[in-house]
Amino acid sequence: MEIENHKEEVPFAHYEVLFRALNPQEVLSRLPDTQWDGAEFTLRLLGREFAIAHPGYAIRALDGGAVPPLPTQTFLLRYLLEGKNIKWNGQWKTFREMPWGEMYIQPYTGRVLTRAAFTFGTRVAAFCKASEKMGAVKLPHGDAGYQFELVPSYRMQILVWEGDDEFPPNAQVLYSDNFETGFAPEDRVVAGDILISTIKANF
């Protein structure tokens, strides 16, 4: 893969190199829901299963659909390299409530909360239809709300409120409490970004 000085391609190339040296058995010991058949890892992201070849990287969707964009593929590589299987204790956290949340809150607000508000709060019906198409669980909160499984054991909720003449649209994203120790803060930002992009792709 020829790499240009690009904000998406350079991180991907970095993790692709690390991925080549990955020990599959070590991955299985950390991520028991991930499968390995001697040639490919199989893992689930937002209800879809993907096969990732190792050591020479290649990705395919088991449903025959499109493969995810490069930032999502980078996230999956980081998950295979560093992911942890941590039990969810049944609590929900905002991004700000988790470690380092205050430090990352400005980029998070722009990339996730504001984007979700104006993408979904202005098209609530489309948001509901796309979320249900993805198999999300409907929630009784907000003008519309759904719960998703990002990767096994890690859940996210998006709640949206429609705007009106007086108030702009609004959104909140909640994370299962195991994100606190299971993902670095920058990966929590990316997780929100991936969730919004995936829902929007199902409009």
Each PLM stretch: what is its role?
Residues V67-N89, S176-F203:
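Ampiphathic alpha-helical segments that act as solvent-exposed interaction surfaces
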Residues M1-L18, G38, G56, G65, ...:
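Charge-rich alpha-helical segments
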Residues R48-T74, W161-E186:
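Intrinsically disordered, low-complexity regulatory segments enriched in Ser/Thr/Pro
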Residues Y104-Y108, V112, A116, H141-G142, ...:
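Domain-length accessory/inserted modules outside core catalytic folds
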Residues L62, A66, A117, A144, ...:
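Short, charged/polar micro-motifs that form catalytic or ligand-binding hotspots
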Residues T122-T181:
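Conserved binding-pocket/active-site segment within a compact domain
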Residues M1-A39, T72, Y79-M134:
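Short Lys/Arg-enriched alpha/beta "domain-start" segment
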Residues V27-P55, V137-E162:
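Amphipathic, interaction-prone secondary-structure segments
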